[in-house]
Each structure stands twice: as structure tokens, then as C-alpha cells.
Amino acid sequence: MNRKTKDLILIYICFALFAAGLIIWGITLKSCKDQMIQPQEVVQEQQAEVPVVYDRPMANPAAQVEAVQQLPEFPSGDEFAAAASFLNAYGYDAMIEDLIPCMNYSEDNFIEAYIGDATTDTGYCFAGSLVICMNNYLVPQNTAIRTVNKSGISWEEFKNYINSGQPMIVWFTNDYNSPRFTDITYNNYFTMYENAHCVVVYGIENGIVAFADSLNENNSGKVGIPEDEFRQIWEACGSQCIGTYYINR
């Protein structure tokens, strides 16, 4: 092999090595770019999957109470309207229509169920029934809050609960007068009254009890009456009330 041939072979080898180097460099560069881009894509996917948590204890739900009006669709739906107003104060988006299917219904048991039809002029229940209804609404959503029947507590206990920033659903009267009892009873102990009405109490201050009334269209349904007057009517209605608690997870 002469020298010229050797030089040509050497040139070809150098050219091949150079070309191979370019190819390897290009592959390496692409790989580096892919590695730089990939984490950004992963981060974006992770951010999209992070849930937004709304269900957490609120500092002062009583301050969030707004009346939910029951008319004209639900003439006797004050219990459901009060429940919607109450739950909304805790950050939920409840409507009367959402709660009606969650209620138990009965022809005579207004302690654990609802008698009648909220879309008519005849329909009523007591605190235990509404607690069941609201928890039937809350449990399937895996919420942290549950409602509890606190009927029978003293007035001081009631005031302390309200003053802690927690609202309460109470059984009152629709005309703000004493209850007018009927002959409708359950277990020969519980007696229904014809002017029964549910409201949501959210404040007691300077001798005035403030509550949201689903039948009052003035002042966005917010009403205030003297504490001694409210207490007398509430106790005559059986001191019925509903509060809440947060479950441990």
C-alpha cells in the first residue's frame, strides 16, 4: 500500500469519526432537552390533580348566615329552608330541592320523619327529623361536619353556643307569638302546634336575638326581637334546637 492510499484511508476514518461524533452529540442534546422539559410537564400534571379543599372548620359560621326564602314554591317548607340556610353558613351550597329527597316521610311520626308535603300548605316535623335529613345530605359527600339534636339545653347553654360563633336551627313560631298547640301528638308525649316555624339564630347581643326567617322578606329575612321574648316562646315550643360538630378523620 503506497503512502497516498494510506492518507486517503486516514482521511476517511477521520471523517467517519467526525460524523459519528456529530450524530452522538445531536442525540445527547435532544435527550438533555427532553429531560429538561419532562419535569415541567410532570409538575403541571401534578398541579392539575391537587384537590381544592373547602370542607374545613370555619372561624365564625354564624356571621355567614343568610335567609333562604321558602315562598312561593314551598309554603310549608320552613324546616328545609332553615336547613339550607344553616348548611350554607358552613360553606355548603345546599338548596331546599336538595334536602327534600334526604328526608324520611311518615303519616304520623314527626319526630323521626316529615309529615305532609313541603310544596303544599301542610307539612311539618320536629328537630330529630331534620337532623336525620341534613346528615343524609352530608354523609354521602364525605363532609367533615355533622348535625346534632341539642333540644332541651338550658338558655345559658344556648347563648354560650351562639356566642361561640355557631348558628343554631330552632323551633319557633311563624307569628312570633306563643305556640298554639293542636291535638296532633306522637307517642302521647310530643304535641304539634299550628304556628310552628323554623328559624336560624346567629347572634345574641345587647338583649336582642338575631335570626334568619325564611318567611320574612324584609331586611333579607333577618329579624331581631328582645331576648326575654324570644326565650319565652322558644322554651314554650320545647327548647328544640340543632347544632353541629366536626367528626374525627
Set out the residue ranges of the language-model regions:
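Predominantly the structural core of cysteine protease catalytic domains
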Residues: 117-198, 202-205, 241-244
